[in-house]
């Protein structure tokens, strides 16, 4: 029999032995504990298991497949990646991969990354005032891995080999050394496989597809110094190049065939710049308006 003893339980157990005048030298401690527990009611307050805590946290962070993509892309950007490739299928419900050429992680760093509240972004509360990264709480990867089957492959510049770690429901299944370039690839499969109540609230594949595509379009417009490649079922949807102008990037993202033209203007302290569509372009739809 295994049980957890804390100071309060030790005190209560000692009180029970004294009150019932039990000769502890003639009876096993486990037998005393059984008698003690038999007379106790089940406590109403108890500590949740770590996997349950992570699954609850996942409900706040992982609302839908696009939220998984968002967290992983932000991690890539925080890792100083210049090329980010995203691939997904079935609205991201069964397969999402995000691969980058960022600084990568060592084996030890991977294992820290899958622990809650482990982060490279801050070390003390004062760091929040100068924070410039997308994330800092260290909750994304452990939350995602608690409700999906996740494979993390990564290598940094200082290591000769990379590391590949497979997880399912937050549990480590395997670890192996691999040959790969510096950077990180994270594959998320079977999202909410162990939380069926969450999966049934996901929308159709097409709706979830659109959320992912819209998200990467927004990232592409905000970070025009990053090359984004977006694939659906291994088929390229769009690809933006590094250091494109806003007009060039809009044309690439929406496949508008040179419909957008760049402009710059300066008047004192005001220097607007952007892109406008050519006069003969009259197609108006929801995706024409992006707020970031």
Identify the residue ranges that each predicted region occupies.
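N-terminal phosphate-binding caps/lids of nucleotide- and nucleic-acid-binding domains
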Residues: 40-292
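Serine residues within intrinsically disordered or low-complexity segments
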Residues: 24-25
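Compositionally biased, low-complexity segments
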Residues: 20-21
């Amino acid at each position: 029999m295994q049980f957890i003893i804390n100071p309060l339980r030790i005190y209560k157990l000692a009180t029970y032995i004294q009150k019932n005048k039990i000769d502890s030298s003639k009876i096993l401690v486990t037998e005393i504990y059984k008698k003690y527990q038999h007379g106790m009611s089940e406590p109403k307050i108890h500590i949740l298991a770590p996997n349950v805590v992570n699954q609850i946290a996942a409900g706040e962070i992982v609302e839908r497949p696009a939220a998984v993509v968002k967290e992983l892309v932000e991690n890539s950007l925080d890792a100083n990646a210049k090329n980010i490739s995203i691939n997904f299928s079935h609205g991201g419900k069964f397969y999402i991969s995000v691969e980058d050429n960022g600084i990568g992680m060592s084996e030890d760093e991977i294992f820290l990354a899958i622990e809650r509240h482990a982060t490279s972004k801050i070390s003390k509360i004062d760091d929040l005032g100068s924070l410039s990264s997308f994330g800092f709480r260290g909750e994304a990867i452990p939350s995602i891995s608690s409700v999906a089957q996740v494979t993390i492959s990564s290598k940094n510049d200082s290591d000769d080999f990379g590391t590949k770690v497979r997880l399912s429901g937050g549990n480590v299944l395997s670890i192996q050394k691999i040959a790969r370039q510096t950077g990180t690839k994270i594959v998320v499969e079977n999202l909410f496989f162990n939380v069926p109540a969450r999966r049934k609230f996901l929308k159709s594949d097409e709706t979830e597809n659109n959320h992912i595509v819209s998200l990467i379009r927004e990232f592409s417009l905000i970070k025009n110094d990053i090359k984004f490649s977006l694939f659906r079922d291994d088929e390229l949807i769009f690809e933006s190049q590094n250091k494109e102008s806003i007009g060039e990037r809009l044309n690439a993202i929406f496949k508008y065939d040179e419909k957008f033209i760049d402009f710059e203007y300066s008047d004192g302290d005001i220097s607007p710049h952007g892109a406008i569509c050519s006069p003969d372009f009259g197609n108006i739809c929801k995706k024409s308006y992006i707020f970031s």
